[in-house]
Each structure stands twice: as C-alpha cells, then as structure tokens.
Amino acid sequence: MQQTRTEAVAGAFSRCLGFCGMRLGLLLLARHWCIAGVFPQKFDGDSAYVGMSDGNPELLSTSQTYNGQSENNEDYEIPPITPPNLPEPSLLHLGDHEASYHSLCHGLTPNGLLPAYSYQAMDLPAIMVSNMLAQDSHLLSGQLPTIQEMVHSEVAAYDSGRPGPLLGRPAMLASHMSALSQSQLISQMGIRSSIAHSSPSPPGSKSATPSPSSSTQEEESEVHFKISGEKRPSADPGKKAKNPKKKKKKDPNEPQKPVSAYALFFRDTQAAIKGQNPSATFGDVSKIVASMWDSLGEEQKQSSPDQGETKSTQANPPAKMLPPKQPMYAMPGLASFLTPSDLQAFRSGASPASLARTLGSKSLLPGLSASPPPPPSFPLSPTLHQQLSLPPHAQGALLSPPVSMSPAPQPPVLPTPMALQVQLAMSPSPPGPQDFPHISEFPSSSGSCSPGPSNPTSSGDWDSSYPSGECGISTCSLLPRDKSLYLT
C-alpha cells in the first residue's frame, strides 16, 4: 500500500517536472525566435529604426500606402507614415545630401565625449544623447567661450547671403550644421544663446512630425536648472513692481457734513460729565445726556442744527485766517495773578448756596439736581455767563466787545438752555467775592482767565484792548473777536 502511494507521488512529480520543462523550453524557443527570427538586430544606414520588413515580409514598408479591402474605399487612403528623422518619400532624391548630413556628427568630438559614429547609425533616442551630454557637461565648461565664438562666426558667415543654391554647396551646409550642433551642445548645458536654434534635420527636408531633439532641448534645460540650482530669469521683472496706491489728501477747505443736533449736544455734554466723573461708564453718561435732551423744547432742538452748521463753517476758515488752537506763548497760571491773601479769600469767601440762588430762578432740569456736577470742557458764551453771575458794573464793562472763549473768531454757538445746564453741571467750588463762579476749569483749551482786584497788575498792552481797567477778567489768553490772529 505504501509502495503504491510512493509510486503515485513520484509519477506526479515527474509529470510536473516534464510540464514545467516543456513550458520553459517553449519560452526559450519563443525568445530566440523573437530575437533572431522576426526582429533581427540589423541597423540600416538609411533608417533610424530596426529593419522589421526584412524579418517579416508581411509588414508594410514606410513608402507603401494602405488601400482598403473594398474598391469603394478609395477615398480613405492612409498617407505614408514618416519616422521623425526620415524625409518624406517625395524628398528621397536628397539622399546624397542626407549622407553628407549624417557625416557631420563626426566633426565635433570635444575631449572625446562623442563617439566617432553618427547618432543615426546608433539608433539612439535624442533623450539618451542629451543625457550623455548633460552628464559630462562639466568637462566642456572651459571651452564655452570658444564654442560661442565659433557659433557666432559660422552663423554670420551663413547669413551673409551668398549667391547660389543652398544644397549645391556642401561646404556651407557642413559649416552650418556644425554650428547648429555646437549651439545644441550649448543649449544642453543651460546657456541660452541669442541665435534661434533649429532642429538638426536637413535644411531642405520637411518632417511630418517634430524632431525629438528640438522637443527635448527645453526639457533638458529645465533639468539643468533644477540640478545646478540656478534660478531661471523671470520673464518680465517690471510687471512684479506694483505702484503703491497714493491716498487722497483731504482738502482742508472742503465743507464738513452737517452733524445732527443730538450728536453735537451729546459730544459737548458727555465731555463735561466725563471731566467731573472719570469713572462714570458710557451707559450712565448716555442716560444722563438722554434725559437732558428729552427735557429740551422743540424749538431748542431745532435751533441746534443751525448752530451746528454755523460751527462747521467756523471750523474751516481760510488757511491764513486760522487762529491757533493753543496759545503760541506760555501763559502763567491762576495763582500768578492773585496774591495769597486774595486766593484764600476767593476759595473760602462764599458758600455753594450762591450758585443755587443764581440758578434757582431759571428752569432747571430735575434729573441733574442730585447728580454730582462735572466741570465743562467746552466754550461758553461769555455774555450769558456774565449776565448770570457778574455784578452790573462788570457786565457793562464786558458787553462791548465780548471776549471770545473759543478758538473760532465768532462767539460760541451754544444755546441759552445749554449754558444754563452747564452752569448746573459745574463743580460747586466757592465763587469769588463778586459772586461769579470760578472759571478756571478749562485753562488748557481757552486760556487762563481769573478774577482779580479792581486794579490788576498786568501788561499795559493787554489792558488797552478793553474799554475799562476795572474789568473782572483782566487778562485772557485769546484776543478779542476783532483782532484775529494770522498765521504766517
């Protein structure tokens, strides 16, 4: 039983070996038949391809045309297929010149890099030839100037316009082809010449398909730039430089857009509230301003836009008539105009109740009676201010001309109720002996103005601009309205 099993296994193994051997033999035979029989390694001098027509006569030659099986298909004749490096059948009479062209490849052998036989006889693709040139291109770096001179001289001699047919001069054709071969070598090494390179096909022949060497020159130049790390010059560097856009300058004489009455009222009032209470939030300030705006009458609300337009025209006087926002000279503070005794009497002379009595006869806002009054940071109308708080002799002295407390040449444009509200919002600092409030809360914006004695000690030039020397406000940092300051 065991012997029978062993014989069966041996028989199966032998059959397997025989089958595998038969297949291997068939493969070897087919390979030998393919190499030696159908595709013989025969290189034809007139063809750049293996002579397939010799081993298999059934294949069509390159000069034959294929006619359809039916006689009705005469319109569908396929044109002859021309290899890249072969001329068309109509140009086969130039074969002698082709032979001279094939011999040109022998001429240029720098440093023994190129073989002594032509590219056509080797049947090497143009890519392989260009790779061979690229690998050994560093050996040609020393001869680049010489090659360039040869190219320029040969092409100049070729383009000189000599009489006679081009194909009838083998020497001229040879020199032109050698120049083109040299220029092709230069282009393989990444050097761009100003000469337009043509494909190394005969000048008189026309190829149905583009030459592989002309199509691979650009690819090899790209590879050279990648390997050598050189940067390809940009096509047009002038396009990259973009002119920066110039910002349009704002015309100072351009009229401003009209501002709403509530915006002007909110701007002036919230500045005064923030000056007194820096820790107040924006919401609290907005509520206070809204309550003050609601308490105003319709006529007062409508008069605010007209005043806003007047103020916008004041903000844009001619350039030579602009008064300075800040005094161009340093003014001493309040303490320099008052003696220590006068200053002490001014600080402790009266109680804050005098301010309440002064404003009690006016229609005051109920929402601001209990809030802490902040100092105003915007100009007030001096006439209204003096009529509210100054004695009669001081009012008569200041009514002509009125002192402008704003940088604009015209008087301030705040309405009467707004001036009253600011009086309520002022700090309860004790007024002076003449029962008018302290107005030094805004010395930086409109100058230092201080109450002084009946005979103040100040500059005579300043006192001459007022009609009386007994003015309550003896010195101010700004000039009267009729003496506007001109900028130089």
UniProtKB/Swiss-Prot annotation:
Residues 302-316 have a biased composition (Polar residues). Residues 240-250 have a biased composition (Basic residues). GO terms for cellular component: nucleoplasm; nucleus. A motif (Nuclear localization signal) lies at residues 223-252. Residues 255-323 bind DNA. It is found in: Nucleus. Residues 222-239 have a biased composition (Basic and acidic residues). GO terms for biological process: positive regulation of transcription by RNA polymerase II; regulation of transcription by RNA polymerase II. InterPro entries: HMG_box_dom (IPR009071), HMG_box_dom_sf (IPR036910), TOX_HMG-box_domain (IPR051365). GO terms for molecular function: chromatin DNA binding; transcription coactivator activity. Residues 204-216, 443-460 have a biased composition (Low complexity). Residues 192-258, 293-328, 363-473 are annotated as: Disordered. Transmembrane segments: none annotated. SMART domains: HMG. Its main location: nucleus. Residues 76-114 are annotated as: Required for transcriptional activation. The keyword Lyase does not apply. Keywords: DNA-binding, Nucleus, Transcription, Transcription regulation. Disulfide bonds: none annotated. It comes from the Eukaryota. PANTHER family: AGAP000281-PA, TOX HIGH MOBILITY GROUP BOX FAMILY MEMBER 2. Putative transcriptional activator involved in the hypothalamo-pituitary-gonadal system. This is TOX high mobility group box family member 2. It comes from Homo sapiens (Human). The lineage of its organism: Eukaryota, Metazoa, Chordata, Craniata, Vertebrata.
